[in-house]
A protein has these predicted regions:
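Short alpha-helical elements
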Residues: 1-265
Length: 265
């Protein structure tokens, strides 16, 4: 337990630097544990409920950390990753995240794994250093390219590197005209103006693929037992925030920010 308490104390001290306030709800009574100090004080169900309520605040914390890690960048990477809620054989009788039609899971296809799955898809933009700038969750059936409509309102004056799923001259023109974003993707060999993808861009794209692998292997982002969409989305947010927090601790300790398997205290 000594290591756990050491990690907890370190993370709590960093949170106090970002936000001196301890509680974020207007309560008539003084709570036994603040919204930050949760370890060993409350039951899991209470913790999950409080975490769902603090989803907006968690994202604010994450954005503050991102701004300290990478205030601005001239190059970003964009990609998506499938998130299953259940196996295909159980999809028709599954009741997970089925509160509303707008947020219910759907069937989708993942070209990288050559599989049809049932669930959601996470769209993410990260820097060349491997820091998640923005992300969103959509139904699995939503095409990757539609996330670019959100990106143009979040980024500007930069290069955006994606895979063939983002190949579209119309979106390229729209991004450049509206936000001065230069979208760069590999071209299909059947295109008239085909030219090989630059090795520099191909190498840069490996960073976001590595981040997704770390989220799967070390944070079990695909293992999610939430029953509601709010709970599902909050757990995804918490795991990405945990990764960003470790990167921030690494930066402060003089370590490589993407060396996630280290002692943080």
């Amino acid at each position: 337990m000594s290591n756990l308490h050491a990690f907890y104390t370190k993370i709590l001290s960093l949170l106090h630097e970002l936000e001196p306030m301890d509680n974020f709800f207007n309560q008539t009574r003084v709570p036994k544990a603040s919204d930050k100090t949760l370890i060993g004080r409350i039951e899991r169900s209470v913790y999950n409920r409080r975490r769902r309520q603090l989803g907006v605040k968690i994202e604010q914390f994450r954005q503050q950390i991102v701004n300290q890690l990478s205030p601005s960048s001239l190059c970003y990477l964009i990609d998506s990753m499938p998130l299953e809620t259940c196996k295909i054989s159980r999809a028709k009788r599954s009741r997970i995240c089925q509160e509303t039609e707008q947020t219910s899971p759907d069937y989708g296809y993942c070209a990288a794994h050559n599989m049809i799955y049932f669930g959601y898809k996470i769209h993410a933009v990260c820097t060349q250093q491997g820091i998640f700038k923005t992300f969103d969750i959509s139904k699995a059936s939503v095409h990757d390219i539609h996330y670019l409509d959100d990106v143009k309102n979040q980024l500007n004056h930069c290069i955006l590197i994606g895979d063939k799923g983002y190949l579209s001259r119309q979106y390229q023109r729209d991004l450049f005209d509206s936000a001065a974003i230069e979208l760069t993707t590999p071209k299909r060999t059947s295109q008239v103006d085909f030219e090989p993808f630059k090795p520099l861009y191909r190498k840069a794209r490996k960073r976001i693929e590595t981040l997704f692998s770390q989220l799967c292997d070390q944070f079990n982002i695909r293992r999610n037992y939430a029953k509601s969409f709010t709970g599902f989305a909050t757990r995804i947010l918490s795991k990405i925030t945990a990764l960003t927090m470790i990167q921030w601790i690494n930066l402060r300790n003089g370590n490589h920010i993407n060396n996630l398997k280290i002692v943080v205290a």
